[in-house]
Each structure stands twice: as C-alpha cells, then as structure tokens.
Amino acid sequence: MGGGIDMSFANAGISVTLLELNQKGLDAGLALIGKNYATTVSKGKLSQEQASARQALISGTTDYEALADVDLVIEAVFESMDVKRQVFGRLDEVCKEGAILASNTSYLDVNEIAAATSRPQDVVGLHFFSPANVMRLLEVVRADKTAEDVIATAMALGKRIGKVPVLAGVCYGFIG
C-alpha cells in the first residue's frame, strides 16, 4: 500500500520519502515501485522518461530522523492499533511542530491513534484504496481533535494528487 501512496504523490510531482524498518523492506518497496512504473511504461501510459522522473522523486530511508522536516507523514503499516500507536508516538517525537500525521487505517479509531501523540490536532485519517496509485477515492477521516486547517489541507492535497477526497468522521469502516 505504501508504494502506491508514494506513486500517487510522485505522479503529481511531489517528492516522497519512503520509510521502512530495515534495508530489506526498503529495497523490496522501492523495487515494487520500479516494477509498477515499468508496467505502466510497457502499457504505453507513460514514457520511460516520465516514469524515471517520477521514480526519482521517491527516496528511501530506514531512519525516522529523516522525517524531521517533512510537512506530512502518511503511515501505512498493517492494521494493528498497538503498532500504529507505536509508530505515531515515534513520529510525534521526530516530526516538526505543525507536521500533519496521517494514518492510512481502513477502520481503526483515529482518535485512539491520535491519543498516542502530544498533538492530536495534527492527526487525520487518509485512507487510500488499493491499489493506491490507481483508485481515486480517498477517505479523509476527521478525529475529534483534528484541526480545521489539517482537514482543509488534507482535502486540497487529495485533489492535488488526483483523488476524490471524501470527508468522514470516525466510525467503524468509515465510508468504504
């Protein structure tokens, strides 16, 4: 899922840093992105030059500290509340003040995820549908304390990357 989200941003000309816990996972993720772009080229939907330019916008790291100055982080780990809370606690420590911390959860309580941080006003759900680089629907999930400017930014960014953003509240299963 993370690779498709990365591609959605790169396809819109936005640079992305892919974080994985280890080099093996990072190499596999970047290779899958490369394979997806190669498939798109082979189908004649992109030139090799376009695919290469987009792929060049995606860098990788295994170090959370590389996210210190980013404006937005989208977490795309598996659907475990414990894991998501651990990730958000770490993001809270390393990301700059005002950075938007988004979860790609498809059904977990964004309020509970936000509670793992000291800045619940900056936490939002951004649920991409699979494959994220193809599917256009994007659920923007407002938690109880999500700030209005975070919602506005998420909605505008969804449009910028070619998605159809739909605002939802926290509920089991959201919209999709």
Predicted regions and their residues:
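NAD(P)+-binding Rossmann beta1-loop-alpha1 motif at the extreme N-terminus of oxidoreductases
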Residues: 1-36, 59
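Short beta-alpha connecting loops at secondary-structure transitions
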Residues: 15-23, 135-143, 167-172
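Short, structured coil segments at secondary-structure junctions
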Residues: 12, 118-119, 161
